[in-house]
């Protein structure tokens, strides 16, 4: 959790829909997207970039690399310091909006994964810059986690459908609104790592839809997500060991793949529409803004832009709490 002086703590509310955020006039895209990879800029101030163009990349490590994409079309106006989602400070590239969009507003037919091999899916995940946000303050490349988990004899993946911190709502709301896509993204990852099965861990109050029959085993378990802690690796492993009688779940360990609904939604969108990570759903609320919601915003959108989209600040806030 990162706290900035001057904005109030978040509140919980019930939401009926998601909202597409305004396209900002400019964005500041962090160079560092995950905790391990060090990227280098591929463009410089004055260059013109398109939406979805790769603007930074890291060296390959066992074939895995980190990549950063421009979330909007425009002109690179400078390099400046910015705060990453996990609270670290790094270089950021400011891009001024200009030109036409490649993805925004385009209707594309989802790709059919049935004819794709696990290797093809893995390469797509690796190329599109998908970050596994299961551990919020230690984001890592999903491809890196898949590669590590796939090395196990009987690899298992666990998908948490709620936020590990009860004060947050992002993953819970994504599960509520996009469970079908989260499920599809999970199947893609399972195929990419040749998983023995998928374990979905949901809040006890969440009504799981009836799941279509799959070739891969799927197990759904529920827990009290309002109890802290309940969504970390240790708690999920204990939950599985206590409640599962499925033989394939016996191999679950800290070396298994643990991920969340946000990451699985990103995976679905990246593979199905060939779309790199250029936007993200965020939950924003507080008693100093007149509205709150789950908003899809461009990567690099500032907190000021978010506040303005919720009606602007109505009073001087006490603190901004990010990821908490």
Where are these regions (language model features)?
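Gly-rich Lys/Arg/Thr-decorated short loops/hinges at beta-loop-alpha junctions or inter-strand turns
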Residues: 103, 156-171
